[in-house]
A protein has these predicted regions:
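N-terminal positively charged helical leader segments and presequences
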Residues: 1-67
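A generic structural signal for short beta-strands and their flanking turns/coil linkers
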Residues: 12, 32-34, 44-46, 56-58, ...
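Glycine/charged-rich beta-loop-alpha catalytic/anionic-binding loops adjacent to active sites
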Residues: 14-16, 73-77, 185-188, 207-215
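Short secondary-structure boundary segments
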Residues: 40, 107, 170-172, 193, ...
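RNA substrate-binding interface of SAM-dependent RNA methyltransferases
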Residues: 63, 69-164
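Active-site/ligand-binding-proximal alpha/beta "capping" segment
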Residues: 159-196, 200-201, 211-213
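Structured adenosyl-cofactor binding patch, chiefly the S-adenosyl-L-methionine
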Residues: 199-241
Length: 241
């Protein structure tokens, strides 16, 4: 069933305009009486029926509302060392598909890509659009935000003050089964850029109480590691069934 995000929580009816209205009328060629789903981006789905439409808008009647079933029971924030080229585009897209709650791009010692403030802002805006499209495509109940580019040490201090950090390191560490606490519902995960984290960064993370975690004996690319980590977390916490 076609599904669209809206910026409100409708009661009896909702009005769809802009690109979504065009998509409904022009691309999908939907008719009055057909059904679609609206999501408020806060985990609620609204099952609707088209009651009227014209070239500018589509009006729908709300039949029922239910919690979105696609949202995981755990919150995962991905802190991703900024990779080269357009690899971050893929990281954002796949992370949203895998159930990430928030994405924080960060600069680490081994980051090659170091955009200036203006370029970084444009990149974040593009990544947010990618997140939005991925959330629409895979039926998410929220729109995972992409935070402004931040510094590694600031990101680690902030996340470590809120929850136990899972620090993925190619030099080895605990398995996810050992790291995951069944009572914990929020996981900040750190993934390095090409070349991984420096020894200094690893020690800094451990000093702040982070758990050094491993994704197995193989060294994964920076764009592969977050997808593998998210999949493993979702599986371990029962969110892949």
């Amino acid at each position: 069933m076609p599904r669209f995000f809206i910026n409100e929580s409708p009661s009896r009816q909702a009005i769809i305009t802009g690109e979504d209205s065009k998509h409904i009328t022009k691309s999908l060629r939907m008719k009055v009486g057909e059904s679609l789903v609206l999501c408020n981006g806060q985990g609620m789905d609204y099952h609707c029926t088209i009651s009227s439409m014209d070239e500018h808008q589509v009006v729908v009647s709300v039949n029922s509302s239910v919690p979105t079933i696609s949202e995981p029971s755990v919150s995962v924030t991905l802190y991703q060392g900024l990779p080269k080229s357009d690899k971050m585009d893929s990281v954002v897209q796949k992370a949203v598909e895998m159930g990430v709650t928030r994405i924080v791009p960060m600069l680490t010692q081994r980051c090659v890509s170091r955009p200036d403030q203006k370029s970084a802002q444009k990149k974040v805006e593009r990544w947010q659009k990618i997140s939005f499209e991925a959330a629409k495509q895979c039926g998410r109940g929220i729109l995972p935000p992409v935070s402004p580019l931040t510094d590694f040490s600031a990101a680690l201090r902030q996340s470590a003050s809120e929850s136990t950090v899972l620090f993925f390191y190619e030099g080895g560490g605990q398995s996810l089964q050992q790291c995951i606490d069944s009572s914990c519902k929020a996981y900040p995960i750190f993934i390095g850029p090409e070349g991984g984290f420096s020894e200094e960064e690893v020690q800094f993370a451990l000093d702040l109480g982070a758990k050094k975690a491993t994704l197995g004996p193989r060294i994964l690319r920076t764009e592969t590691a977050p997808v593998a980590a998210l999949a493993a977390i979702m599986l371990t916490t029962g969110n892949m069934t």
